[in-house]
Amino acid sequence: MATLSLPLPHLTQAIPARARPRPRPLRGIPARLLSCRAAMAVAPDKEEAAAVALDKAVKVAVAAPDRAAVAAVGVGEELPEGYDQMMPAVEEARRRRAGVLLHPTSLRGPHGIGDLGDEAVAFLAWLRDAGCTLWQVLPLVPPGRKSGEDGSPYSGQDANCGNTLLISLEELVKDGLLMENELPDPLDMEYVEFDTVANLKEPLIAKAAERLLLSRGELRTQYDCFKKNPNISGWLEDAALFAAIDRSIDALSWYEWPEPLKNRHLRALEDIYQKQKDFIEIFMAQQFLFQRQWQRIRKYAKKLGISIMGDMPIYVGYHSADVWANRKSFLLDKNGFPTFVSGVPPDAFSETGQLWNSPLYDWKAMEAGGFEWWIKRINRALDLYDEFRIDHFRGLAGFWAVPSESKVALVGSWRAGPRNAFFDALFKAVGRINIIAEDLGVITEDVVDLRKSIEAPGMAVLQFAFGGGSDNPHLPHNHEFDQVVYTGTHDNDTVIGWWQTLPEEEKQTVFKYLPEANRTEISWALITAALSSVARTSMVTMQDILGLDSSARMNTPATQKGNWRWRMPSSVSFDSLSPEAAKLKELLGLYNRL
């Protein structure tokens, strides 16, 4: 029996040549380089020359083999050359990421409200410098202007229109639609005063729209194409007609309009169009100007590698073009008045529940119509955002129905939503889309099942984490990869404000769970906790980055005054926030979110 003579005879001396195992390659060195290793072992006196040869050989790139080729290799057979180069790639859907929640109205802006001009561009550049790849905004619809709505982006008059108060006057000057000397003096207000801003900006935006309509250049051609866009036409005309009627009739809602207009008689609508043709055209041109500026921001964000996450309220306001033009899709009586309205029972945001008063959908009628209204709405959202959150996602599994005559949300009952039939129709029409499910509040098993069936991430909020026991789903050790974790949402207090009113027992839990809370600002302790979470996506609010108290809170649910008004302090510029950007980027790198 033949034996081998190697430098380690005590290991190999008795091994037959035929049964001798193949030399195992060094980690990262292809099998074809084994001759180099053998040369070093057999001829120690030539180790230096062999090492040089090995170094040269290692530098030769070997492409990883095709997966199919590897799969075809039988058990025990030799794998293709380059097999050890088949390193698993990180799928984009598995890449960890982080972003900032900041509604555009909260940017500084020169005219009392944030806009889509230089400050929005500066914010995107700051996000890039901070290593963030997400900008989350609230709904971009025109905010509610009636009593009690107080600028709410969740009470808009149309689900598809853009908020024209966000239009930058300075960008209109660049487009040649306004003159420099027509711009008003800067309006530096600590908080947004929506009526004041509207009185200042709306006449100038209307003037710019009128000049656009009178022009014959490239911009006018773009406007004509905008109106023909299938994602725009239809809802745009309904919204313009609705606005024209609304301005001409002093009524609380369309329910009080004269019967021919209330019920959309063709002759009545034609009469309104002829009488208010100029207003209607200007209205539509303003929507084009919003779209033009927003797409400019989206294009710049994409250039920087930043995705924009939108927000879609599940319900729409009763006094809206959506309900007026699509009555059969809502639970209304024969006169057009809601039979039931939306709300939620008591939850973490409100001890008495919340009465939203939006009309509920007639899901049976919608399903019979192929969910056409919703498909159009989703297509519009995809025109504005890279991904979006569906607010009150649980309403698609089961919704809280409150009789319209009730004054409190406690008087209600649960009713079944459209469930998978809705998403089956949606995905068939538009394909798979990036949806985030807002699954806060009363979350039952069917809501979880629905969310997982469409592979939509849910949410966790750290401000909810420290009450209750160790099984609290908002505690970081209970997070899941398929989640978006927040320090707080627009409905929460700032972290500083939350901390100032947190019961002492819960504070002690925070100190035990987050030891760094003893050594740093509490807002940054929660930011760190959010970024270190196993959740794929982490979102922090700009208020928490700035370490602001309750005076910077965006919204207090179940209240009607003082909400949606916060703006970044006038003393702060994005240039001055370089230290915060560096601090955030360091944390993102530490937790693999760059």
Swiss-Prot record:
InterPro entries: Glyco_hydro_77, Glycoside_hydrolase_SF
Annotated coiled-coil segments of the chain: none
Listed Pfam families: Glyco_hydro_77
SUPFAM superfamilies: (Trans)glycosidases
EC number: 2.4.1.25
Chief localisation class: plastid
Compartmental location: Plastid, Chloroplast; Plastid, Amyloplast
Transit peptide, start-end: 1-37
Record's catalysed reaction(s): Transfers a segment of a (1->4)-alpha-D-glucan to a new position in an acceptor, which may be glucose or a (1->4)-alpha-D-glucan
Assigned GO CC terms: amyloplast; chloroplast
Swiss-Prot/TrEMBL keywords: Amyloplast, Carbohydrate metabolism, Chloroplast, Glycosyltransferase, Plastid, Transferase, Transit peptide
GO biological process, one term: starch catabolic process
Functional note: Chloroplastic alpha-glucanotransferase involved in maltotriose metabolism.
NCBIfam families, sorted: malQ (TIGR00217), PRK14508.1-3 (NF011080)
Family label: Belongs to the disproportionating enzyme family.
Xref: PANTHER family: 4-ALPHA-GLUCANOTRANSFERASE DPE1, CHLOROPLASTIC/AMYLOPLASTIC, 4-ALPHA-GLUCANOTRANSFERASE DPE1, CHLOROPLASTIC_AMYLOPLASTIC
Full protein name: 4-alpha-glucanotransferase DPE1, chloroplastic/amyloplastic
Organism this protein belongs to: Oryza sativa subsp. japonica (Rice)
Gene: DPE1
